[in-house]
Design a protein with these regions (language model features):
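Loop/turn-rich, solvent-exposed surfaces of beta-rich toroidal or solenoidal domains
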Residues: 39-49
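Serine-hydrolase catalytic core recognition
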Residues: 121-431
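Multi-bladed beta-propeller domains
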Residues: 3-33, 48, 59-84, 92-95, ...
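Structural motif
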Residues: 1, 52-57, 97-103, 142-148
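Residue-level detector of Asp-centered blade-edge/turn motifs that repeat once per structural unit
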Residues: 39-41, 83-84, 128-129
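Short loop/turn segments immediately following the C-termini of beta-strands
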Residues: 49, 93, 100, 138, ...
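Short, conserved, GDST-rich strand-edge loop motifs in beta-rich repeat architectures
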Residues: 49, 91-94, 215-216, 220-222
Length: 431
């Protein structure tokens, strides 16, 4: 809005609007702050998903014109205006949804240049004089290390640290997992990461790892924030399992339509994507359709429950870790964006909450939950357990962790949890 200070009148310059909810990198909402500021006394900059992807725009107040400085099927992140206000610096996944690089572009939209070139991920800070960048860089199987580089195209990075990987870590051949796309039932491309067994060790069983948070990206070329699960997936592959990890509908990094694909129905299109991944494994990778399991935590735990309760012919075993079981009892600020308010959209909550579909459980379920979880409260696991008891289900178990919050901190808890998950899969997928 523009305010005429003499009259107090307001004039609309631009509007962020979404039938689902406003979000995306640099736009605001979903954990992101909004990028907006002055290029000069007559021009402002901001980010918008108006094109379907979060891009950089400028608005000239004198001519009342808007211009997109970036455009395409990619997202702009970490926007910085140079101190002389001649350039914008930014991270984007222009080359590939799972690859980030650092760019600069003139404030008039010309002369866009890529400054970093390594395949992987970057977390970048500009030096005060903007002549250098310091960044953490990582690759799929190489943890984050610190580098510096001159802030110009074609310059070579200088590695500062070599501390992330211990000698024991380096002795193991961590998989450089393949990233590829599979086609969903509606024709959309789903980005996947595949952990393949070594030749001669493959069995016909598969496990799908379901990342948490909903709006998060885990199919990418940098070191995963799910590094424990990444290590566990390597272990599963060593034992002959084929493991697949997908960026299902509502994962980050893929634009507005993907981000809002679960509006009014969590466990809808996102679960369809998991089912389509399972069918891909059977059709293309020699997997037995009776030997597919899945696991995940938080939103991934919720998805595991929905999969076992509503798709029992697809998934034969699952581990739901700290799962949401009833969205009406979860964080209002998170849920109301996606499902609206329980009082005015009860249908969305009913069809999205696993506790309403417990009767569909036919196969084997492991639930793991910390008793002092301040994110997904332990009551979710208790209420679900009571419902399972009421329905006479005997193919489930609950592992309780008395000292753990949402993110476990005790090594013994992590070890116990993953020993139970491994036992679940070995028992019910390999028989």
């Amino acid at each position: 809005m523009q305010v005429d200070v003499a009259t107090g009148k307001l004039a609309l310059l631009d509007r962020q609007r979404d039938e689902a909810w406003i979000g995306g990198p640099g736009v605001g909402g979903g954990g992101y702050g909004a990028n907006i500021g002055w290029v000069n006394d007559s021009c402002i900059y901001y980010q918008s998903e108006a094109s379907g992807y979060s891009h950089l725009y400028v608005y000239n107040l004198r001519t009342a014109t808007k211009k997109a400085l970036t455009q395409g099927k990619y997202e702009v992140q970490n926007l910085v205006l140079s101190s002389n206000k001649k350039y914008f610096y930014l991270l984007s996944n222009e080359a590939h949804p799972g690859q980030k690089n650092w760019y600069r572009i003139k404030t008039d939209g010309t002369q866009k240049e890529k400054i970093t070139n390594q395949l992987g991920g970057y977390e970048i800070s500009l030096s005060p004089d903007e002549k250098w960048i310091a960044f953490r860089y990582s690759y799929i199987n190489k943890p984050w290390e610190l580098f510096i580089q001159e802030n110009e195209p074609g310059k070579k990075p200088i590695q500062i640290t070599d501390k992330a990987a211990s000698e024991e870590f380096k002795k193991y051949a961590w998989r450089d997992t393949k990233i590829k796309t599979i086609v969903a039932r509606d024709g959309q491309n789903i980005y996947t990461r595949i952990y393949e067994p070594k030749p001669g060790t493959k069995n016909k069983a598969a496990v799908i790892f379901v990342h948490g948070a909903g709006y998060l990206q885990n199919v990418h070329y940098w070191w995963s924030s799910y590094f424990r699960e990444q290590m566990f997936n390597n272990l599963l592959a060593d034992k002959g399992y084929t493991v697949i990890d997908i960026d299902y509908r509502a994962s980050s990094g893929y634009g507005r339509d993907w981000r809002t694909g679960i509006y009014r129905f969590m466990g809808g299109k996102d679960l369809d994507d998991e089912v389509d991944a399972a069918k891909y494994l059977v059709k293309n990778m020699g997997i037995d359709s009776n030997k597919i399991g899945l696991y995940g935590g938080s939103y991934g735990g919720f998805m595991t429950l929905m999969a076992l309760f509503t798709q029992p012919n697809v998934f034969k075993a699952g581990a739901a870790l700290r799962p949401v079981t009833d969205w009406a009892h979860y964080n209002h600020g998170y849920t109301s964006n996606i499902l609206n308010e329980p009082v005015n959209d009860s249908i969305a909550y009913a069809k999205s909450s696993p506790i309403n579909f417990v009767g569909g459980l036919k196969n084997h379920l492991l639930i793991c939950h910390g008793m002092v979880d301040l994110n997904v409260n332990f009551q979710d696991a208790v209420r679900l357990s009571q419902r399972l008891i009421e329905l006479g289900k005997d193919n489930w178990e609950l592992a309780v962790y008395p000292v753990e919050d949402h993110g476990f901190v005790e090594p013994s808890s992590w070890t116990d949890e993953y020993k139970r998950i491994l036992k679940l899969f070995d028992t019910y997928l390999l028989k």
